[in-house]
Amino acid sequence: MHHKVNVKTQREVHFPMDLLQACGASAPRPVARVSRATDLDRRYRCVLSLPEERARSVGCKWSSTRAALRRGLEELGSREFRRRLRLADDCWRAICAAVCTGRKFPSFSVTDRPARARLAKVYRMGRRLLVGVVCRGESVVSDLKQECADLRRVIFEGSTRIPSSSLWGLVGVLGWTSPERAMQLTFIGRALPYGSPDVERRALASHAATLSIPAECHPNYLVAAEQFAKSWADDNLPRKFRIYPIAVQESSCMEYSRAQGGLLQSFRKGFVGYDPAAPSADPDDLELAKERGFSRIRASWYSTFRYRGELKSTNQSLEARVAVVPERGFKARIVTTHSASRVTFGHQFRRYLLQGIRRHPALVDVIGGDHRRAVETMDGDFGLLRPDGRLLSADLTSASDRIPHDLVKAILRGIFSDPDRRPPGTSLADVFDLVLGPYHLHYPDGSEVTVRQGILMGLPTTWPLLCLIHLFWVELSDWAPARPNHSRGFVLGESFRICGDDLIAWWRPERIALYNQIAVDCGAQFSAGKHLESKTWGIFTEKVFTVKPVKMKVRVRSEPSLKGYVFSRSSAFSCRMGGKGITGIRAARLYTIGAMPRWSRRIRDVYPGSLEHRTASQRYGEPVTVYRFGRWSSAIPLRWAVRAPTRTVGNPVQSLPDWFTVGPAASSVAADSNAFGAVSRVLRRMFPGLPRKLASAGIPPYLPRVFGGGGLVKSTGLTTKIGAVASRRWMSRIGHDLYRSRERKSTLGRVWTLSTSPAYAASLHEVEKFMDRPDIILTRKCRNPMLKHARELGLFEEVFESRVGGGILWASLNGKALVESHSPSILQVSRNLRRSLACPSGGFLRPSAPIGKLVQRHTLPRGTVWFLESSATDSARQGGMGLPPPPPPPLGGGGMAGPPPPPFMGLRPESSVPTSVPFTPSMFSERLAALESLFGRPPPS
């Protein structure tokens, strides 16, 4: 179809940001901003009523689109028609967000024939989306999501030029045929609207069908899993179970819904008479309060919530409700709601397991939240990856729902068979009961299912156990046949990183195949089209990167090696950079050709084999090709840009306005991906008028949130000068906080948090009182205050945050709301910021100071906190006379004295649970035969 365009009045058309305009309708009038529903209602009533010649901004056949919409309105009714219209509009906004990331916003000259052809494709794409969703339903959205997955698969397969017809022709319209630019379009799939009711129903049906099917693992896997867990616990977990502060949430539980107060209301009803210590209390009092709280939690498992709550039967503690949570990406997540006591007690196990998980090199950066550093350090100490390896980006479907119970029990048995690693008064059967149940699930449609496989997403222990099981699969994949990857015989590095069910690994093809086999044997199912292998591209937790080949010279030196069961030979090498001479020699490290999992290498103690001593010799080879980390993709996530987030991090309940949430979301994405230019362009197009709204309320829109500003992003990023985004009054207060206050931190950012959480505000006030006490000393990091009775409490940030977080329970039990019942107004936040700007001692900042340097100073460690013991303070108060201090308060106060709690009701005794058998030399032949039967071949030697 040829478009008739009046070139005298219209010479250029920009990419349409409005879906109806993309179908050829007239552009929306510049009226005052209204709500989303009202705006859509006005738009579609306008375009349906106007004559064709008036409802057209450029030459386009609008009449057929309007007729299809009218038919859809008559067939569906007004309510369903509007829902589908909003669904299509959200899909188009996801496409527009990806388009806005480009350096130049696309426009089409109507005097150029190729440009008119590209514009016609835009109109066809908009009509396909709008009319398809309204008339055919949600299958069009699923097709768009599959197109994004197919485009990513094409990029990972190594294509150097992407076909122009990809993603409904959008690649050709924009001219983004390079893999780097086309990668941004694949993030449209994760930014699609929330899952619809049909998506939720399908997710619930799949969840019930999966959990109701019993599954078992091969016995050889169970033996290996228990040995792995026991070795991992011995190497990483503390010898004794630790007690942690009670986690406070307003999430729903079996006793109380979220509207009724949730888990916090259960604390108030169950902890009657419990008086926790205030955040300003002495360190010893806080430790005693934690022990008292843990005792109440342990007692609540069998008494408090079963008899004082709404659950009347002891068996009902294994009851759980199923809830569906729609997510962006047109999908839905299934979660479960459990009794408050089990959730609270499970958090103790979760934090104990995380103490050991964070010590593993593949998980330490992930637990710390630095996923980019986790990937960048994959190439190890040498910066080398074997040349015959491939990047595996694993993606599992319903990973936690498909894990067999016997495999989970083997892992738990290996970890908690030692009584010292369990909470006082608990048995191994109690651990099984807490983690696995078996739980009886109640679905929203009234159906009921007893769980026969899988670990539920509503329990705190699920994610740590998923990490351990995934780590077990990875370690077991070391059984794959190893081979030299060079004629000289040396073996370079392999590496991997884990985050729950996400895996990124650089492995030889044999190990990838064995990992896939092990995971499938243990019940896993890989996502079709998302479980990717590539020689160049990798993706880990939605962060895309590349690796690059590098040629290096390698020196090989033979070493004495262990012969026998597994180890046949090993090599050590050091590398020299080529080019203009030698730039450095790296330290040598042994790499084994025949590899075993680390947890199995203890076999050397019982089967030492024989050592063959040789005279070390050195050989130099030609430069070989190895791989290193390349660079991060410039693509950014788009979920935050489609619609303003309604919640902030750490505040999962309260609904907040866009001026409150867009700034932190944009700053987080820009800082994580170092793409300040792309984020600023998306902000300017997707949220027009937001900077003006913040500035009119007296809030600097482009000042970081830690300094009290709106948190929006400029294209200059961290190099932006403070004088360009803040007035002298703001710079004076920020300079005082950073350079003249005791904390050396800006306190303006707390105003935003205090406006949403009264409990946080009360806890923060108590901690500030504690830090101002005369017996609290702040020194530089690793410095001693040179006082005899000073006790180190830790770094300032750790002490401050732990006391504030632990004090939220104290504030909540004393009547403070965890979150405000209403959203804060912009005028309220503005007034609080103006009051906080008062600075009695003044301050100074150069207007040319970069924002990045100021943020860096704000995040610097502030030193070590020391506490003067009571003997020192009493001696000081009494003039140095050295009188004895008053006696300490008796232990067990607060009504906690009494006999120990009875054993848990309805649980099996510990003696009935099989325990792990220690590995002995007599078991060697049986173990070898079992492994041969499992893999169909003898282990590599």
From Swiss-Prot:
Assembly, per entry: Forms a ribonucleoprotein complex with the 23S RNA, where a single polymerase molecule binds to a single viral RNA genome. Since the viral RNA is not encapsidated, ribonucleoprotein complex formation appears to be the strategy to survive in the host as persistent virus.
Organism: Saccharomyces 23S RNA narnavirus
InterPro entries: DNA/RNA_pol_sf
EC number annotated for this UniProt entry: 2.7.7.48
Entry GO terms, CC: host cell cytoplasm; ribonucleoprotein complex
Function as written in the Swiss-Prot or TrEMBL entry: RNA-directed RNA polymerase that replicates the viral (+) and (-) genome.
Protein name: RNA-directed RNA polymerase
Biased composition (Low complexity): 905-918
Region listing for Disordered, in residue ranges: 875-918
